[in-house]
Amino acid sequence: MTGFDSIQVRFKNTTHRQSPFANTRVVPFVQSYLNILKSVIDDVKTEYFWFFANFMSLEEIDLDYIPEQHEKDQIHVWYNTNLKGGTNREGNVFLIPTAKFKEQMDNLKFLRDFKDINYHSHNNLFQN
């Protein structure tokens, strides 16, 4: 696995899955992913960091993923396309470039307003 920092967002009243990362900070869901990111970004010390909901299974994601040179400034989002697993086009698993997020965060109204987002569809990314 990469040595990237990770942030797990804890939702109430849902199945909780343990983070596969040793260096995970768990934070409660408050208002929006963007607000959470703004509140924790100064604690992130790695070039990229994983950001994901506690109800997501990360078993099918390549946790060693490192963006290609032409994708290095993008937020990478994995989302499920299997109806049995629940769908959310905006996703609940992210790999975020720390410096680029810091550059843009004050001008974002919504996380989806980030300049460059790379959506990775996945047919077996279960959530509950």
What annotation goes with each model-predicted range?
Residues 40, 47-60:
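Short beta-strand-to-loop acidic/aromatic patch adjacent to the donor-nucleotide binding site
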